[in-house]
Amino acid sequence: FPEDELTGKQLTENNCVACHEDKSINLASIDTMALGTQRELVAVMTEGKMQEQAKHLSKAEINKIATYISSAEHALLLKCSRQLTESDLRSGSNWTSKGNGPLNKRYQKNTNINSSNIKNLKLKWSFRLKGWDARSQPIAIGNLILAATKDTLYALDSDTGCAFWTFKSPSAFRVSPAYDKEAGLFVFAVDQELITYKLDLLEGKLVWKTQLPRESEWNLSSGSISITNSHLIIPISTVETIAPLNPMYECCTTSGGIAKVDIQTGELIWYHRIEKPAELVGKVRVTRTKKYAPSGSAVWNTPGIDLTRNLVFFGTGQSLQSPASEFSDAIIALDLNTGERVWSTQTLAGDAYNVACEVPMARQWGCPVENGPDFDFGASVIKSFTSNKEEIFLAGQKSGWAFGMKPSNGEIIWKNRIGMGGVLGGIHTGMATDDERLYVSNSDRASLRKYDWDPKPGVYALNIDTGEI
């Protein structure tokens, strides 16, 4: 058949099935993607991770694939019968950002839930999020829950699950919104295309929006906003890691970064690019395609803000092309006022990796010489205190190693390996502390790679002073 006469089923079989039904690649299956709406699937192919794989398809063909995979055009919504008021914001406990504060502790002091009564919890209501995955964590302000998913931010009543208001973005929301009481009755969000929004908290009306620096279509938001009463700190990631599956793609030029934005005006105060501009470093032997480095060092996690030392602190991902950079797989601290690098501590050198390393055919043209092991810092770095009240940064890596560091210079105080590690963790996300212990989730999910440890998935409590379990 000519391409324009192929059915949605044929187009899906020709373009999607080989990878999405291969369980070793860890992609969403066709059945899983069927949980999404047609609009969401189109967005994945036109502006998301699959844009490189779908660029040879016409708009009509993309729509056919989306329509074949999913029958859902849009999700239904139950609207509240009353308006949101300030009194709704004063009841209950708050969780105001991904890290529940600029130190990323992810700890709730004001709760009645404990190990004795958690078994008594019962489902009160449920709310169907768009799509097949939940990319961001909701935040809570009194009786209000703010949940961002795909192209919509929902303001929900915690008693009933109805929506007070919704705000739609032209692009997907992948990360948590943020709120700070001192900044007023406003909520802040950033979408996949790095457009940042300030919204009226009670009505969801737009106050301002700002386009953050986006050097490439591969740059996007993946870590959430960190906030104080005067500024936003926003991480910038890159998904160029998937592009080298194309044998003619010139890998790679993008970099992770951090942006600081004024809360009142939306003005960009500074932007810190992790890597220097990429340079030509050679050509692929098989295809003669050009190779560029340094690249990568994505910031997947939510940055912390240390107001005592005037620092922004965060972790980075792997390099995308060899030779690997000194700033990949590192914990970095920036000056809060200027965005200049204060210190950087790399925990693993020589880690250059992209998705081509996982696909046998693509490995010959797309995989960097160093070939991984892809040990990013995906979990947010935490600022806490030792038993002697000394400040400490706590970090966890996909390698399965946890670290305690000096906030002043990044010196490693202790390190402890709790898991096998892997391309999917290791310590991928989900660390928290009550300033007595560091709680760490360890994945150790199986992949095609072999490691020198047996998998030890689970949740671990570590001594903050020593890192001991």
Model feature map: region roles:
Residues 136, 174-175, 223, 301, ...:
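Structural signature of WD-repeat beta-propeller blades
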Residues 102-108, 132-136, 242:
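Short, solvent-exposed loop/turn elements at domain surfaces
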Residues 82-124, 274, 279:
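Blade/loop signatures of beta-propeller domains
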Residues 18, 25-74:
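Extracytoplasmic electron-transfer domains, predominantly the class I c-type cytochrome c fold
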Residues 38, 115-130, 153-173, 179-218, ...:
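Extracytoplasmic/lumenal domain signature
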Residues 1-7, 60, 71-93, 102:
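N-terminal export/targeting leaders of redox proteins
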Residues 3-22:
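Sequence/structural segment immediately N-terminal to covalent heme-attachment motifs in c-type
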